[in-house]
Swiss-Prot record:
It comes from Chlorobium chlorochromatii (strain CaD3). Zn(2+) binds at residues 351, 402, 532. Catalyzes the attachment of threonine to tRNA(Thr) in a two-step reaction: L-threonine is first activated by ATP to form Thr-AMP and then transferred to the acceptor end of tRNA(Thr). Also edits incorrectly charged L-seryl-tRNA(Thr). This is Threonine--tRNA ligase. Belongs to the class-II aminoacyl-tRNA synthetase family. The lineage of its organism: Bacteria, Pseudomonadati, Chlorobiota, Chlorobiia, Chlorobiales.
Length: 657
């Protein structure tokens, strides 16, 4: 194809490699993919035009930057699985007449749909639904987008579909929207913004995984529904690989390993979603906190501490109360001796408290940047069905930092926050990290604080910082927080799963709401910019991930017990005790096993406990002032003089190995 426009009917499309391809005006994304290669056209799911993800059959009528999205693209699985939820709903509708549908999003691993049906779904129903989904896939029905007015959509879902849930969304959630989009495939129609697959035939492999109870709109006072989960793939091979990963994930489940390794406890007597750290788990958490504190000190952060509750007016002022009201614990109401009522909330966020600390005194431009940091515990009343050990809890601790800086310092400070986050992940063994620039949705500006101009500047600064740091990022429209754009870090664990962890967020909104100022070099008051930054995100969730990523095989510096001292016989106990005490004196976490068990049993138990180092002590070692070292999962590493080995271990720990 020519590299230059040959007629007024041609448009220029810039590909990710910056090459330019000229196509006829009115070409679709599929046409463009086919012009590049037949295999790409077969794999194409959707396109990205000027950073916005669109249907593959979208008509392109002007010059644009274009990217063909496949299943391996960052956006690919979400599109695939969202379309699969529609496919599942169609199958359910065909099998169980009268079923109605609530929400059906893509999730981190697959999708779900909330179903209202007189039929109580069972395991055997899932197999029947799977079979019908594959049957519909073979029909290869095209998926068509239709836009209409909100009033037309209400009439359609009232009289044609008889779907009260979609009518409620249209009349309440979308009451200020003039036009909406519907997607049709065969005889099935759903209300959706899209984008979706071009046809049902793209879905080749289906696995429905489980059924749980849910409530319409997450409100326990509303209708109870049945939530059906599933996952799909464009090939059977990918599904088989996924099933193998699931089996491995079960072996690595942090809830299972947490109990086996005595790391944390979840007790119904304390309450659902409120984990307690056992001594070994507390050591891991303490080491991680010490690691981050040390690195933050090097970068000029200063610690603060804030209460676990706050006056409800504080969170109304920040905007967190209306934004998080559905997931907060009920307010605590008190009356003072004069009868005046005060309401308090369990702290849902640390940010407002830090803003008040900033505003507690006048700040000069010379004071900035000012970097506050806190391991602050916050509380969210997550639905019981969404709780998942440490990964989703009701009480969790954030490694929360807020940087207050001048606008001219902003990009440098974002870069510094990116560098710290990357360093943390590298140290902890996460080699694969994706970066998402989470921007706001201009079509839904009312959802966000601040003006369109403020958002434009904030997003420009975030993008500039990411590019300066050489970050290979992708853009997520609509993924921003309500007060600003953010950089989200998504790590891939040892079995290929993706976890969103650290974040760096820019905020022009809170300085306005809290009237934060500094005195500039001109003697006038100016607004600082705030950066919200949390490499771990949540200590609980991060440690849950770390348990699963390592399968409980923590590196030496992080292991709750670093060394097990294993005397072979009773006559070796005194020397073993001396070695044990020297390890403790050197700051090494050690345990001494003086049970009357055979040495092979002691080694096996230490291996099962995933202790990194085992020191076997018999007559030879005792006579020569030595120890025999075994490394976890590696076996015999040789005999060493005790002093020499202690120094070696201290160095490994200091280097965080």
């Amino acid at each position: 194809m020519s590299d230059h426009k040959e007629s007024t009917g041609a448009i220029a499309l810039t590909l990710p490699d910056r090459s330019v391809r000229n196509v006829a005006m009115g070409s679709t994304g599929y046409d463009v993919a086919l012009s590049i290669g037949r295999k790409l056209a077969q794999d194409a799911l959707a396109i990205k035009l000027n950073g916005v993800v669109c249907d593959l059959n979208t008509l392109i009528n002007s010059d644009a930057a274009i990217e063909i999205i496949t299943f391996t693209s960052p956006e690919g699985p979400e599109i695939f699985w969202h379309s699969s939820s529609h496919l599942m709903a169609q199958a359910i509708e065909e099998l169980f007449a009268g079923s109605k549908f609530g929400a059906g999003p893509a999730i981190e691993q697959g999708f779900y749909y909330d179903v209202s049906s007189e039929h109580r779904f069972r395991e055997e129903d899932l197999r029947a639904i799977e079979a019908r989904m594959l049957e519909i896939s073979k029909r290869d029905s095209s998926v068509q987008r239709q836009e209409m007015s909100r009033e037309e959509a209400i009439a359609f879902f009232t009289s044609v579909r008889n779907d009260p849930y979609k009518v409620e969304i249209l009349t309440e959630t979308l009451k200020n929207v003039e036009r909406v989009s519907l997607y049709h495939q065969g005889d099935f129609t759903d209300l959706c913004t899209g984008p979706h697959l071009p046809s049902t035939g793209k879905i080749k492999a289906v696995l429905l995984t489980n059924i749980s109870a849910s409530y319409w709109r997450g409100d326990s006072n509303r209708e109870q529904m049945q939530r059906i989960y599933g996952i799909t793939f464009p090939s059977e091979k990918l599904l088989k690989e996924h099933v193998a990963r699931i089996e491995e994930a079960k072996r690595r489940d942090h809830r299972k390993l947490g109990a086996e390794l005595e790391l944390f406890l979840l007790s119904p007597e304390v309450g659902s979603g409120l984990p307690m750290w056992l001594p070994k788990g507390a050591i891991i958490r303490s080491e991680l906190e010490s690691f981050l504190r040390e690195e933050q000190r090097k970068r000029g952060y200063v610690p603060v501490y804030t209460p676990h509750i706050g006056n409800i007016e504080l969170y109304k002022r920040s905007g967190h109360y209306p934004y998080y009201s559905d997931s907060q614990f009920p307010p605590l109401t008190y009356h003072d001796e004069d009868g005046k009522q005060e309401q308090y909330l369990l702290k849902p966020m640390n940010c407002p408290h830090h803003h008040l600390i900033y505003s507690s005194k006048m700040r000069s431009y010379r004071d900035l940047p000012l970097r506050f940091t806190e391991f602050g515990t916050v509380y969210r009343h997550e639905q019981s069905g969404e709780l998942n050990g440490l990964a989703r809890a009701r009480g969790f601790t954030q490694d929360d930092s807020h940087i207050y800086c001048r606008p001219d310092q902003l990009v440098d400070e974002i870069c510094s926050a990116i560098e710290l986050t990357q360093f943390v992940f590298k140290t902890l063994g996460f080699a694969e990290v994706q970066t998402r620039l989470s921007l706001h949705d201009p079509a839904n500006q009312a959802k966000y604080g601040g003006t369109a101009e403020v958002w434009e500047q904030a997003e420009k600064d975030v993008q500039e910082a990411a590019e300066r740091m050489g970050v290979d990022y992708f853009i997520g429209i609509g993924e921003a927080s309500f007060y600003g754009p953010k950089i989200d870090f998504i790590v891939r664990d040892a079995i290929g799963r993706k976890w969103q962890l650290g974040t760096v967020q820019v905020d022009y909104v809170m300085p306005e709401r809290f009237d934060l100022t500094y005195v500039g070099s001109d003697g006038q008051k100016h607004r600082p910019v705030v950066i919200h930054r949390a490499p771990f995100g949540s200590m609980e969730r991060f440690i849950g991930l770390l348990i699963e990523h390592t399968a409980g095989n923590f590196p030496l510096w992080l292991a709750p017990v670093q060394v097990a001292v294993l005397p072979i016989a009773e006559e070796n106990h005194d020397y073993a005790t001396t070695v044990y005490r020297r390890l403790l004196a050197a700051g090494i976490r050690a345990e001494l096993d003086t049970r009357s068990e055979k040495i092979n049993r002691k080694i096996r138990d230490a291996e099962m406990s995933k202790t990194p180092c085992m020191l076997v002590i018999g007559q030879k070692e005792q006579a020569n002032g030595e120890v025999s070292l075994r490394r976890h999962r590696q076996g015999d590493a040789g005999r060493f003089a005790t002093d020499e080995l202690i120094e070696t271990l201290k160095q490994e720990i200091a280097n965080r190995q």
